[in-house]
Amino acid sequence: MRNSLSFQDEPIVALATPLGVGALAVVRMSGQGVFDIARKVFHKQGAPDFHLASSKGFQAHFGTIHDAQGVVDEVIALVFRSPRSFTMEDMVEFSCHGGPVVVQHLLKALIDAGCRLAEPGEFTRRAFLNGRIDLLQAEAIGEMIHARSESAFRTAVTQMQGRLSRQLEEMREKLLHSCALLELELDFSEEDVEFQNREELREDVQRLQGEINRLLDSYQHGRLLKEGVATVLVGSPNAGKSTLLNALLGEERSIVSHQPGTTRDYIEEPLLLGSTLFRLIDTAGLREGEEEVEHEGIRRSYRKIAEADVVLYLLDVSHPDYCNELSDITSLLEQASPNVQLLLVANKCDAITNPTERLAQLQAAMPQATVCGIAAKEGDGLEALKQQMSNMVAGLDKLHEASVLITSMRHYEALRRASDALENGACLVAEHAETELVAFELRSALEAVGEITGKVVNDEILSLIFERFCIGK
């Protein structure tokens, strides 16, 4: 990838819509000289001498694209003039017919006329480098495009609009003010001048740390909104996990067999309940495997359990020894995260005579669990199970409306470093430490917060962020 930190305005071009067959496709150009490039290939209908450089911004013009062989397609050319464009550069967007061959001819004509094919995320990267958006907003655009649930989409939109950016900028301004006063003291160290009362400084630092810690606390919920609730289906072989997965999805996604050990590796599929995404993970049945490949499948099951947000343990209550599994469930939870939730699903309730009593016994034996009864093969109880799953994350889909959430591990790590630095700084102030030591910690916190919005940035971070974008974004 090219050096993102150097100023770039060379003309770039890319397809901005998905490649494939459709009614329309949009090809966009940005950079210095795009109007001159367009003049070489675009002919406005009824105005052979027309030049897009003479057009006002936000105006559309109908015409044809030409290459060396002749007419390529009829298009609409939409003009954006710097700085009133997404990249803050001159831009032209061509709407053409949505066939892959048409698009290829149009792209080739523009490249032959002087454009360079854009790199992944280069349009958004230019928007960031030119000051149109900050780095957090750039990431939010990517998250909005890839959102798989309404909640994830709304959270990304909130961040794209700058709500979190404004909060972080307020923190940064406060830190910058304190750092400036401490730097003044260092400049006048021989005169023993104190520009900021130390008790007030300690209180300010602790208050800022509290704000940052509240953002850190939001990451667990933000991660669930963005990535989905990791729901691991666990149980003994032939408990009905694959049958349940297929029933929840409404399609035959997992192989169902009476032969134990059919599932050798985990299968992951998305399930949208309301506006919350669940990532259903069907795992190999927990038993002593007879083959090495089955052993590996079981090891992978345990790894997924350790990463789970919800463990959905499927229990075959028609089996005479089903109670023996309860102690196994307790041992299993010891390998899961402390915040994991247990959903104990009693399967094959249609095969017993007293399902209500059986469920009550299970609830009494496992008070930490949410207990639900189903008959997966017949589809009985599935709606109640889905409701229980939704109840376990109740309110998650509304959090983006009331709170500012952290959804990115990069943001979380930067804020954690900022919090640690502020905690160190407050302790140093309380211990009447040297001003230089306090200033170092506050500068560290300032730098960490600045990394999130791009006030402090390096090319490696930019490359990691923007290479995840599509070419035309």
Swiss-Prot record:
- Which domain of life does the UniProt lineage start with? Bacteria
Where does this polypeptide localize? Cytoplasm
Q: Which cofactor does it need?
A: K(+)
Instruction: Please state every residue range assigned to the domain named TrmE-type G.
Output: 228-394
Gene3D superfamilies attached to this UniProt entry = P-loop containing nucleotide triphosphate hydrolases, Probable tRNA modification gtpase trme, domain 1, tRNA modification GTPase MnmE domain 2
- GO cellular-component term (any): cytosol
The record, for Pfam families, names: MMR_HSR1 (PF01926), MnmE_helical (PF12631), TrmE_N (PF10396)
Q: Which residues bind GTP?
A: 238-243, 257-263, 282-285
Cross-referenced SUPFAM superfamilies: P-loop containing nucleoside triphosphate hydrolases, TrmE connector domain
- Positions of (6S)-5-formyl-5,6,7,8-tetrahydrofolate binding: R28, E93, R132, K473
GO MF annotation list? GTP binding; GTPase activity; metal ion binding
Where is it mostly found?
Answer: cytoplasm
Keywords assigned: Cytoplasm, GTP-binding, Hydrolase, Magnesium, Metal-binding, Nucleotide-binding, Potassium, tRNA processing
InterPro entries referenced in this protein's UniProt entry, alphabetically? G_TrmE (IPR031168), GTP-bd (IPR006073), GTP-bd_TrmE_N (IPR018948), GTPase_MnmE (IPR004520), MnmE_dom2 (IPR027368), MnmE_helical (IPR025867), P-loop_NTPase (IPR027417), Small_GTP-bd (IPR005225)
- Tell me a GO biological process for this protein: tRNA wobble uridine modification
The residues that the entry says bind Mg(2+) are: S242, T263
Query: What subunit structure does UniProt give?
Result: Homodimer. Heterotetramer of two MnmE and two MnmG subunits.
What is its biological role?
Exhibits a very high intrinsic GTPase hydrolysis rate. Involved in the addition of a carboxymethylaminomethyl (cmnm) group at the wobble position (U34) of certain tRNAs, forming tRNA-cmnm(5)s(2)U34.
Which family does this protein fall into? Belongs to the TRAFAC class TrmE-Era-EngA-EngB-Septin-like GTPase superfamily. TrmE GTPase family.
The protein, known as = tRNA modification GTPase MnmE
- Gene that this sequence comes from: mnmE
